[in-house]
Regions:
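Residue signature of alpha-solenoid helical repeat architecture, marking inter-repeat boundaries
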Residues: 22, 57-61, 99, 139, ...
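Hydrophobic positions within repeat-based interaction scaffolds
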Residues: 24-44, 79-82, 272-275, 279-384
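Conserved alpha-helical positions within TPR/SEL1-like repeat arrays
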Residues: 66-67, 73, 100-114, 139-154, ...
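N-terminal leader/linker segments that initiate helical-solenoid repeat arrays
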Residues: 19-70, 74, 79-82, 94, ...
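Alpha-helical solenoid scaffolds that mediate protein-protein interactions
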Residues: 43, 49-50, 88, 95, ...
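Helix-turn-helix repeat elements of alpha-solenoid scaffolds
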Residues: 35-48, 75-87, 118-126, 158-166, ...
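Eukaryotic all-alpha helical interaction scaffolds
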Residues: 47, 52-54, 92-93, 112-113, ...
Length: 384
């Protein structure tokens, strides 16, 4: 009789745990998760075929909407709202499933970033990092850190972007993801350059190129070429630009390469060649900054050759584009400064929350151990 009572005492919590979701439709999500890394389109198709989602348990519903959001994000489906991923964040916030909790907050950040809500995106990304040390999904951590770094660079707060971008490089290195490292190193190099560390920027781009293999990313070659031109390494810069041009897929992507190539020819006193590429930028580049760069270099050439009327005309065109760019940047800067102070408040609050959560977890663990000791002691006392 006593043995039966002991058995029931052990069995009751097991039955209670296993009853979660009882009476609800259950789904095996493993096939979807296996498809997600390489075939997110197939994963999305499977998820969309699931019917009666309202009959899912709360746990399965959270898992479903997390996977659905991930598949949509990876297949570039336009996000309209964060209401579905909120079902996942609300559920996982109450659990100890750290990786899914972090992933849910990350995708909530991604959606809000796409919806042009950078303040909310930053908040959710930082929430995803609250228990960073205990998460081993380096692909997820790399994306979170890289996105936070990117948001800081948009604000031109480069010193705050730097540590997150360094973490992103390390996360992708731990994962042995070469292309992840390439993109993270490129972004890190840009930040180093904006902070005035040209040597560090060169090293980042050199490392990125060494990791590429056959998967050429033209922008890295172009940016390294620009850095080499500053150091008068013109022959090396020319080789990099040729590689960049040979690997461009979209026609409009050639203009940033043309701008650097025009600057190289100008430095090398090959004025006709310089004018050809710079004029193409001034007339046809889709981005105002690239057009402005072409006009500025052409203006400098005209002044050097004492072509005063041409120089005046180019100067007028350049200043017109520059003024419109500066007005846009000033408006953006005001928004960014306001956001930056808000980000600081959020970051401080979330780091305090992380510390509090860590302390609470410690006390919770102690209380669980204490309860187990008391339970075992009670069982042995009862048996005796």
């Amino acid at each position: 009789m006593k043995k039966n009572i002991v058995f029931l005492l052990i069995l009751i919590p097991i039955i209670w745990i296993s009853c979660d979701g009882m009476g609800h439709q259950t789904i095996d999500f493993r096939k979807v998760e296996n498809l997600m890394p390489q075939h997110p389109d197939s994963a999305l198709m499977l998820l969309e075929q699931i019917e009666n989602k309202e009959n899912l348990s709360r746990k399965d519903k959270a898992h479903y909407y997390l996977l659905l959001t991930e598949a949509q994000d990876k297949t570039f489906v336009k996000h309209e709202t964060d209401s579905l991923i909120t079902i996942a964040t609300d559920y996982y916030e109450e659990t100890d499933d750290l990786e899914r909790k972090a992933k849910a907050w990350f995708y909530k950040g991604r959606i809000n970033q796409d919806l042009n809500q950078p303040l909310k995106a930053q908040e959710y990304y930082l929430k995803a990092l609250r228990e960073e040390e205990q998460i081993k999904d380096y692909a997820l951590l790399g994306r979170i850190n890289n996105n936070i770094g990117m948001l800081y660079t948009y604000q031109t707060v480069y010193d705050k972007a730097l540590p997150f971008q360094k973490k992103a490089v390390e996360d992708f290195r731990m994962l042995k993801d070469s292309m992840g490292q390439v993109f993270a190193l490129r972004d890190l190099g840009r930040t180093f350059l904006m902070l005035g560390y040209q040597d560090s920027a060169i090293i980042c781009n050199q490392k990125a190129i060494a990791l590429m293999g056959k998967n050429i990313l033209p922008s890295v070659y172009t940016e390294l070429a620009g850095l080499y031109i500053e150091e008068q390494r013109l022959e090396e810069a020319y080789g990099l630009l040729q590689t960049s041009l040979q690997n461009i897929v979209k026609p409009q992507a050639k203009y940033p390469v043309y701008l650097v190539l025009g600057e190289l020819y100008k430095k090398n006193c090959q004025i006709d060649s310089a004018r050809f590429y710079l004029q193409a930028c001034a007339d046809s580049a889709p981005l105002p900054k690239t057009r402005a760069g072409g006009l500025f270099q052409l203006k400098e050439i005209a002044f050097a050759q004492k072509q005063w009327e041409l120089a005046a005309s180019l100067s007028h065109r350049y200043e017109s584009i520059r003024d419109s760019i500066e007005k846009e940047m000033q408006a953006e800067s005001i928004r960014n400064v306001q956001a930056f102070y808000s980000y600081n408040d959020i970051e401080r609050d979330l780091w305090e929350a992380r510390l509090y959560a860590s302390q609470q977890k410690f006390f919770y663990t102690l209380s669980i151990i204490g309860c187990h000791v008391l339970l075992v002691g009670s069982i042995f006392t009862f048996i005796r």
